[in-house]
UniProtKB/Swiss-Prot annotation:
This is Histidinol-phosphate aminotransferase 2. NCBIfam families: hisC, PRK02610.1. PANTHER family: HISTIDINOL-PHOSPHATE AMINOTRANSFERASE, HISTIDINOL-PHOSPHATE AMINOTRANSFERASE-RELATED. InterPro entries: Aminotransferase_I/II_large, HisP_aminotrans, PyrdxlP-dep_Trfase, PyrdxlP-dep_Trfase_major, PyrdxlP-dep_Trfase_small. It catalyses: L-histidinol phosphate + 2-oxoglutarate = 3-(imidazol-4-yl)-2-oxopropyl phosphate + L-glutamate. Coiled coil: none annotated. GO terms for molecular function: histidinol-phosphate transaminase activity; pyridoxal phosphate binding. Disulfide bonds: none annotated. SUPFAM superfamilies: PLP-dependent transferases. One of its GO terms (biological process) is L-histidine biosynthetic process. Keywords: Amino-acid biosynthesis, Aminotransferase, Histidine biosynthesis, Pyridoxal phosphate, Transferase.
Amino acid sequence: MLPFIRSDLAQFNAYKPHPSSDTASAVPPQLDRLDTNESPYDLPPELKQKLAWTFQQVIESNRYPDGGHETLKSAIAEYVNESANISSLRFTAANISVGNGSDELIRSLLIATCLSGEGSILVANPTFSMYGILAQTLGIPVVSVSRNPDNFAIDLTAAQSAIEQTLNPPIRVVFVVHPNSPTANPLTANELRWLKSLSERILVVVDEAYFEFSQNTLVSELAQRPNWIILRTFSKAFRLAAMRVGYCVAHPEAIAILEKVRLPYNLPSFSIASALVALQNRAILLESIPQTLDERTKLINAFSQHPALAVAESAANFIFLRLKADSDNSSDTTLLNLHQQLKNSGTLVRQISGGLRITIGTPEENIRTLNHIQTALIKPELVG
């Protein structure tokens, strides 16, 4: 290891955005990418044409992008009010910060709260891994608690004990995903009560990356809870994963701090233009959601009928599939083999935390996924 590199990074494992495709083996001719929870649908051609015109006629490539994002922030605030059914104007541009993906916002939150030994973070695993990864890159301690293996509810007794016993440094941020990834379950009433009971000295970050699929938001809590921040993204339902646009909704004082620590010109002009076009045409982009939810139901029903598979209900655009503990195929080796068989067949899914996280794709992709899994489970090499 190079002598000028921090020693704690020697054993650090970097995040692999597409771990299923991280291979030198031949790529199947038919590849269904269901491993990163993206939308299976590209932007409509007319919106791409509009963006192409914007790039040619409006964007000056030799100029830095809009560093203040005021137009985009105002458009986001309007959408947040609309999506939460808030009749009076509650959120404005002062409540919004925009990042190069939600990852940048998470990193900015960590810098603003925990750096220099000021604090540690609490997560309930399995959950979105970037909270822990970004904290580790900054030298911030990560405290982990578990979830119920049956319904994936957070172990609140362990979480409360962690809050009380972690003193050097104390827990300053609690991260939750609503609904959670990879398990797809929303926050429970007990979890919400616990989050509301936390001291105002603790920042509660509620990641609503999959809000458009769950239609369950906690933004109305922000008026009474200045220590809460809501994260959202354009990468899922808005079909802009390639543009890397995330945003958060919070108290204006929290937003002002985030603006201090974020990088200047953090969003390219084309990303800003894409997000604005997406918001202006949200009715068109979001009309695919009912079909995604219908396809999700079909997959859950189909997998539930298989004697070796366990699949929970989902409030997101993905499902979490596990092998039943009492089946002949319940070993970790069997799961690894199943994952490899799917990859060989041209279906990329994410193997994580004792299961497979499968993004809901197009109807054709979902049929292939179902067939590939059913075929793989009857192969002799998958028997544990």
